């Protein structure tokens, strides 16, 4: 879940 959020932020 956190990984997906990180990608979205980028």
Curated annotation (Swiss-Prot):
Keywords: Aminoacyl-tRNA synthetase, ATP-binding, Cytoplasm, Ligase, Magnesium, Metal-binding, Nucleotide-binding, Protein biosynthesis. GO terms for biological process: translation. One of its GO terms (cellular component) is cytoplasm. It is an enzyme of class 6 (ligase). Its EC number is 6.1.1.6. GO terms for molecular function: ATP binding; lysine-tRNA ligase activity; metal ion binding. This is Lysine--tRNA ligase. The gene is lysS.
């Amino acid at each position: 879940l956190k990984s997906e959020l990180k990608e979205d932020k980028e």
